[in-house]
Structures are given as structure tokens and as C-alpha cells.
């Protein structure tokens, strides 16, 4: 049960593909999606680098729908003391903790073949890959996306009008 093997070879990849192929996103909107490589390098709980170097040491083929790698969660914290995976400082001023949701990351544990990092109520935890959790969907879009209004903030999110 390797979480990552020869690309994002797992149930999570299958889920992303099924979301993309479904009618959740209309084809007119999918035209603005930009496929990107995903960083899926494994990391140990003791590694403190949050630059993306560890996770980006291995990448998938480009995909249109994905989720975040662990380093992206760590870097979202505005607390300068967020330097270790298990540090409570990483939950401070972190956009991803606004709803205290539970969700998977793309990052697997380097020391096992079956554990994956997930965010659980604002904390980083290691969980067996056969457990259930939510996905925080990430879609990259090109700069030509027709914005109706908004500034991208939590209070005034972008409103997209892809029918223009």
C-alpha cells in the first residue's frame, strides 16, 4: 500500500481523476485549469525543512486537480516559529486552520509505506492511508479567468463568471 509509487499511484489519485471527469466543474470552467506537477516526496516527522525541497524531490505527472503537500500547510502559517512539523506555532495564523477541518495532504511518511500526513483539527498527524478524511481540493487556473468581483480574501472571495 505505498501512498506514492510511480506517480501518484493511489486511491487519492483516482479520486482526483473522478472529480475532474465528473460534472462538478463544467467543461467551460475546466478550460481555465492548468495541469501542474505535484510534490509527493516522503518526509520523516523529524525533518524540519518547510521550503518544499523534501516534498518536491519527487513529482507526479501534471494533473488538473490535487491537494496540498505538507510543506504548503506549514508555509501558510504566518508564525515565524513554525519550523517543526509538530509545532503548535504552525497552527497560529494559518489560513488552512480557519475551519478546523480534517484533511489529507499529499505527503507520505518516509519511515513507513502506509502512513500519510493529514491535518486534524489544526494539528499535523500521521494516519494510516486506509483511514478516511476529507480532501482540500486545489485547482490551478490561468490568468485569463474572467473574474466577476472579489479580491481573493476570505471575506471577499473571487467570483468567477466563466460564461462571459
Range-by-range predicted roles:
Residues 1-164:
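Collagenous Gly-X-Y triple-helix signature in extracellular proteins
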Amino acid at each position: 500500500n505505498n501512498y506514492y509509487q510511480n506517480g501518484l499511484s493511489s486511491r487519492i489519485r483516482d479520486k482526483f481523476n473522478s472529480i475532474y471527469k465528473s460534472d462538478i466543474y463544467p467543461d467551460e470552467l475546466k478550460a481555465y485549469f492548468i495541469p501542474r506537477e505535484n510534490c509527493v516526496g516522503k518526509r520523516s516527522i523529524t525533518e524540519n525543512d518547510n521550503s518544499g525541497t523534501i516534498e518536491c524531490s519527487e513529482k507526479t505527472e501534471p494533473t488538473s486537480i490535487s491537494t496540498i503537500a505538507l510543506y504548503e500547510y506549514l508555509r501558510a502559517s504566518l508564525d515565524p516559529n513554525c519550523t517543526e512539523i509538530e509545532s503548535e506555532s504552525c497552527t497560529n495564523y494559518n489560513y488552512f486552520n480557519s475551519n478546523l477541518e480534517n484533511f489529507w495532504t499529499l505527503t507520505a511518511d518516509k519511515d513507513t509505506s502506509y502512513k500519510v500526513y493529514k491535518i486534524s483539527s489544526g494539528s499535523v498527524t500521521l494516519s494510516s492511508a486506509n483511514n478516511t478524511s476529507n480532501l482540500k481540493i486545489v485547482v490551478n487556473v490561468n490568468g485569463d479567468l474572467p473574474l466577476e468581483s472579489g479580491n481573493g480574501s476570505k471575506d471577499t472571495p473571487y467570483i468567477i463568471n466563466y460564461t462571459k
